[in-house]
């Protein structure tokens, strides 16, 4: 998956979760909680200023909640 594909998938969603190939499932996210870093890295802003980084290549499923 690349940045453009991910943006297209989530553009109309309000809340979504990201599932990776190694079994990680994110908390419920919205577009304000993610940033793109470098060409192939997704930054998830979590609580208390904690960040989590996911390679776009590791994304397996995106579940649109609403």
Stretches with model-predicted labels:
Residues 17-19, 48-57:
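Short linear motifs in low-complexity, proline-biased tails and propeptides
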Residues 22-50:
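Acidic, low-complexity, intrinsically disordered interaction modules
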Residues 1-25:
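Short glycine-rich, low-complexity segments
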Residues 1-4, 62-66:
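Short acidic DE-rich linear segments
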Residues 32-34, 54-65:
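Structured surface patches comprising rigid loops and adjacent beta-strands/short helices at the edges
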């Amino acid at each position: 998956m690349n940045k453009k594909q991910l943006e297209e998938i989530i553009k109309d969603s309000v809340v979504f979760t990201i599932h990776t190939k190694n079994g990680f499932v994110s908390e419920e996210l919205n577009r304000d909680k993610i940033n793109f870093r470098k060409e192939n890295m997704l930054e998830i802003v979590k609580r208390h200023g904690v960040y989590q980084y996911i390679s776009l290549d590791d994304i397996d499923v995106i579940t649109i909640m609403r």
